[in-house]
Structure formats: structure tokens, C-alpha cells
Amino acid sequence: MIVDNSKDFDLKSFLANLTTHSGVYRMLDKHGEIIYVGKAKNLKNRINSYFSKGAKDSKTLMMVEQIARIEITITPSDYEAYLLENNLIKQHRPKYNILFKDDKSYPYLVISRDKFPRVSFYRGKSAYKKGQCFGPYVSISSVKNTLNTIQKIFPIRQCENSYYKSRVRPCLQYQIKRCLAPCVGLVSQQQYDEQLAILKKFLAGKFSSVLEEISAKMYQASEDMEYEKAQVYRDQLVVLRKLQQQQIVDIQEDKTFDVIGIYMQDSYASIALLQIQNGDVVADRHWSIDAKGQDKTSIMHAFLSHFYLGDEIRNIWPKNIILSKVEFADITDLMNSISQKIGQAINWIIAPAADNLKWLKLAEVNARQKLNIYTSSKSQYQKRLESLKEFLESEKDIKRIECFDISHFQGEATIASCVVYTDDGEDRKSHRRYNIKDIKSGDDYAAIHQAVSRRVSSGLEADNLPDVMIIDGGKGQIHQAEAVFREYGIQDKVQLVSLGKGVERISGKEKIYKGFDDTEYTLDEHNPGFLLLRQVRDSAHDHAIKGQRKKVSANRQSSIIEEIEGVGPKRRKALMMYFGGWQELSRASVDEIAKVKGISKKLAQEIWECFH
């Protein structure tokens, strides 16, 4: 239940009437933004402590000064409170909470929700939306190797739905016994589901159970004189047993565990997580954060909640977790909540010895090294920001920079890229591209005008305009952006600057133009602010090129056949229905192409020559 939802907030009355139940509280500022999320066993005691006369660190004092309203949610148990707290922190990213940015999105194997499901892989936490997930895997290569192994053992389809729906005959995968061809009805729903169920057990790590089940099915099929079916099971067993023999390490040895090391220096902290399976380091992940006013225990508490109570899907959980030394009593409840979520007991090792101590020291060495790199990079970036601020004569700190670049192929497939840098560095998740429409071929000025106009329009609506907008180009390009700024009346809200290569077109010799200022500026090529301008510009250029190449590739594939005389919409559709896609068509022989209804041998030869 939300206790307060009004604009007029009486803090004194609120504190006096607080419940003593467990739950989650949210601190909001005068703008209605959540600035802190916390969890408490006793909401009344915890929230009142912020306003008591006891000693508090500077960060807490600063936060309390900004509190305009407090909201609470009562939860039935500590476990639910931890989950809600973690979800709210990830959703709102309050500025006074300890925040972790995952180093990268890990790949998952996904079994889709189709009638005849496919197995594939996706990156990131959104994978669960595609179907049932297994993972995460350490790298793309490891997940691809697993997919390849699966295809040798379990004949479950891996093709895209568009390809699957267009089939009128079995593909090569069926011929080499790596797919049951549900696309053309060569397998019953029951048979397919049976293979799928065994595959799921295999991916869940139930190796012995899979061997027993397939063996039993093989003998049963043999007794029922279904010899072809028995042979399929026998072939599966052969591959599985070879795979089993390759596992040199005894899986019964308890060697699956996580090691979490923390290193703190000044106002920063770094967490290194080593994931150990069967005695080998299979993953090294790390997080570096601003930890001003925090101690090691509070950082560990926040990390454990973020990593183990988050929404990352995993099928294998560590039996042991080794931690840097923290106050055990302060995280006991959280440990219990993690075990409750997993559904199994975890052995928490906070005072490791012998080999466990060696693992912890290794994690802490990794954390220290990562923090040194992080602080060095952050310091250099802050110097560049300050230098740019000085050059632009800005009165306020630069919190957000956006840069636009245009890319096209011979005047066509025009793309505008927009990359984002914050005071923490590049924000890849906020990068975007604009498909430019309804302009003359190769008109970069019109493209810049359209892209900037669309961004400013949406930025005013969402109230998220940047502090600085960079345009890749010279006077002509910046004049287009100036026109947009005048149209929307934001000349005083966003600082505009462009970077042109000039006559020499040499990196480091670019000409700089400020918005609404006809002066041509130059800076020393080693000037920190100039280096930042070029860094952001280069990032925008790369982002634009990648998007434009994708667009050209898509356009080319669909236009290759259109160039052949005699191949109209009906024949193109027939070709796609028969082969399922451009890739399969490009691999087909002349004789195979000629089998398509309406395609003569001569026309098949012309189509084949288009791809070779």
C-alpha cells in the first residue's frame, strides 16, 4: 500500500504515524523524483533515524535536505521487501543508492514458445521474453558451441520463424538428421515434445537423468519393434557418452562456487566476481562504483542484492559463495532471502582459509586492478569535460553530451546517428539512429535538420535535452541546427558546437564552430576538451556507418532479384516460398531454382548468375 500520494506532505505527521511492519520506503525530492530506495524490518524506526540527532555522513545529510516526500510499501516478509527494493532500484536508479552497471549482457539459450519451439540464443535480460531461458553463458563462442552440440544430439529446429513458415520441403538439416522437419509435418507433436523435454533436462544439467531416459526409451522402442526409433535413441546415446567421457573432472567434487572480492580507495570501490566451475575460472566480472560515505559491508549488501536477487536468469547456482570480510550479522537476512529465492541452501564463507583464501585474494587483486584502471580513466575523462566546459564558457557543469552524424551510400539509405556521453562517460544504451526520409539524394544539410528537429521535439516533451549538442560538420551543418534551435526557442538551453575537418581534412586540425557565433576556432590537438570533441564525434561516425551498412545490406538483398527482367512480384514470392530466404536461394543450383513454379531453366540460370 502507498501511504502518501499527495502533493502536500506533512513530514511530522507522517513520522508519527508510521507502521512498525517491514517494508520498502522511497525518498522523493521536490520534483517528484525518487532519490533513494531502502528496505527496513521496522519502517518506523528506520525512517525516523534519518531525522534523529545522531551522527550521519555527509552524503546522508545531503540526501535528507532534499527529501520532499516519503512513500512506503508494506511487505509480508523480509524476502519480498528485498525483492521489491532491488526492483525499484533497478527501475528508478536513485542517485543516493549504490548503483551497479553490469559490464556486459551475457548470452542465454532460449527455447521459444512456438507450437514447435526453436532453440536459439539471445543476449541480455530481455531474453526471457522470447521463451524459456538457460544460462547465462560466458561468451558467444560458448553458447554457439552448445548450440552445435545440441544439434548433433537433439533434432530440434534452430531456424528463424520466417524461414520455418515458408518451407514447402525439408531443408538440409533434415537430410543430415539434425532436424525433425516439423515445418512440413514430418513429425508429430508428441514426438517433437518428447525430444524437447529431454533437451530441457540436458540444458538444466541433469546429465545422468537424460542418459537413463534415452536408454529406457531405446530399449522400449526395440521391444515394440520400432527399430528406426530405437536407432535414433542409440545414436543420441553414442554422442552423449562421448561427451560424458570428455568431462575429465569429477563433477561430484564440490567445485562450483562464486568468489566476491572488494577493494576500496578514496571514494571509489570495485567488486570482482570470479565464477568457478569444476575448479576453473569460467567468468570474471567486475563493477566499479562511486562509494562515497559507504563502508565495505553496505557495498557488499547492495551487490549481493543486485546480483543474486536481480532478474538475471540462471540455471546453475553456486553451492558456495566466498566473500571479502564483512559484518556477518548485517547481511544474514539478505543471505536467507537469496537462499529462499534459489530454493537451496548456500554455504557462505566469510572467513576463508587454505585454497578458499587463495581464491579470495585472487578476486581482491582483480578488484584492485580494475579500480586502478577505472579511477585513472575517470580522472582523465573529468579533465576533458572540464576543459570542454572552459572552452564553451559554460556556467554549468556538463552532464550530457549528444553528437549527430550523417551517413549514406551514394546518396541513398541515409542514416543519422546520435550518440550520448554523460558525466560518467559513454552511455551506449542511449545511442540511437534515425532513418532519414523525404529529402533529396545526398542532402546532408536537410538530413541534419530533420534529425536534430526530431530529437529536440522529443527532448522538450520528455524534458531530457542535452547540455551540449555536437554536429559533425562545418558551417552549413551547424546553421541547420541553429535554425531548429530558433524554431523551438532553445538557444539558451543547449550549447551547440560543430566539428568540421576543414580544407586539410586531417585529424587534429579540425575547425570548431560554436552555435550562433561565426568565429572559426582551433585548439591544440592535445587539448583535453578538443580530444573529447573528437572522441564523441568519432563514436557518432562509427555508429552511423554501422547503421547505414545494415540498411544498405537489407536493401541490396531485396533488390538483387528485382533487377532481373522477367522476375516480378509473383515469381519473387514463389522463390521465397520455395527456398525460405535469400541466403538459401543464393546457395541453390540452377537445377534447384528451375524446380520453382514459373521459373524456366534460362531464367534460373540468370538468377543463379546474380549471386555468383
From Swiss-Prot:
Q: Which GO terms describe its molecular function?
A: DNA binding; excinuclease ABC activity
Q: Does the record's keyword annotation contain DNA repair?
A: yes
Signal sequence coordinates: none
Q: Where in the cell is it found?
A: Cytoplasm
Going by the UniProt record, its keywords in alphabetical order are: Cytoplasm, DNA damage, DNA excision, DNA repair, Excision nuclease, SOS response
Q: Which residues form the UVR domain?
A: 208-243
The cross-references to SUPFAM superfamilies, in alphabetical order and at most eight, read: C-terminal UvrC-binding domain of UvrB, GIY-YIG endonuclease, RuvA domain 2-like
Q: Which SMART domains match?
A: GIYc
GO biological process entries: nucleotide-excision repair; SOS response
Choose one Gene Ontology CC annotation of this protein and give it. Answer: excinuclease repair complex
Q: Which InterPro entries match?
A: GIY-YIG_endonuc, GIY-YIG_endonuc_sf, GIY-YIG_UvrC_Cho, RuvA_2-like, UVR_dom, UVR_dom_sf, UvrABC_protein_C, UvrC
Domain GIY-YIG: residue ranges: 20-98
Look up keyword Phosphoprotein and say if it applies: no
Subunit: Interacts with UvrB in an incision complex.
Family label: Belongs to the UvrC family.
Protein task: The UvrABC repair system catalyzes the recognition and processing of DNA lesions. UvrC both incises the 5' and 3' sides of the lesion. The N-terminal half is responsible for the 3' incision and the C-terminal half is responsible for the 5' incision.
Q: What is this protein called?
A: UvrABC system protein C
Q: Which organism is it from?
A: Francisella tularensis subsp. holarctica (strain FTNF002-00 / FTA)
Biological classification of the source: Bacteria, Pseudomonadati, Pseudomonadota, Gammaproteobacteria, Thiotrichales
Report the gene name: uvrC
